[in-house]
A protein has these predicted regions:
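Basic/polar N-terminal segments that are highly enriched at the extreme N-terminus
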Residues: 1-5
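Short beta-strand His + acidic residue motifs that chelate non-heme Fe in jelly-roll/DSBH
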Residues: 87-88, 104, 110-117
């Protein structure tokens, strides 16, 4: 797991493009048959990716988290941006098609990711944050997401935000698959 320390807001103002990229850009997230994670001391967030091609990949805590298992004190959201894949959470299998997501709550011990077809591997992008309460695992389809349109064309900042895991989702019971 790569570690990133916080930067002083005052110092960041003096960074040139190369330094900004060095401090904040995450590259090469999707590596065949690997889980890559970057831990940022800013908000203690972990950004990561898993691209299982020829084998299933298990999410491990690593010594950086000082935990018995990855979600012992954390929660996470996973979105599949590749081919069809499966995420197994404590023995329950969830099939994630392209753009499907899953919220996995604190306390889940085993998270395993695999591709259905190695010629079209799943690409699981995820974020994980500290959690203080356990919520159930929730399977999320793109049509379940909350879409928010922001900005304007006139201001050159028009965009659509697709919220896979708004706060209310952790309290809902959505389809399990």
């Amino acid at each position: 797991m790569e570690l990133r320390t916080a930067s002083s807001p005052r110092d960041v103002k003096t960074y040139d493009t190369a330094r900004l990229r060095e401090e904040f850009l995450i590259q090469d997230l999707f590596r065949p048959d690997e889980v890559k994670m970057v831990y940022s001391h800013i908000d203690r967030i972990i950004t990561g990716a898993a691209m299982p091609v020829n084998k299933a990949l298990t999410l491990a805590a690593g010594e950086e988290l000082r935990a018995e298992y990855f979600l012992q004190r954390r929660e996470m959201g996973i979105i599949n941006i590749g081919g069809e894949g499966k995420v197994t959470v404590d023995g329950t299998v969830y099939t994630l098609r392209h753009r499907d997501g899953i919220y996995v709550g604190r306390g889940c011990k085993d998270v395993v990711m695999e591709s259905v077809d190695s010629a079209k591997p799943a690409k699981f992008y995820f974020n994980s944050t500290p959690a203080h309460k356990a919520y159930p695992t929730v399977y999320i389809r793109p049509e379940d997401c909350v879409n928010v349109e922001l900005g304007s064309l006139e201001q050159s900042n028009h965009r659509n935000i697709c919220k896979y895991i708004p706060v209310s989702y952790t309290h809902l019971t959505l389809p399990t698959n």
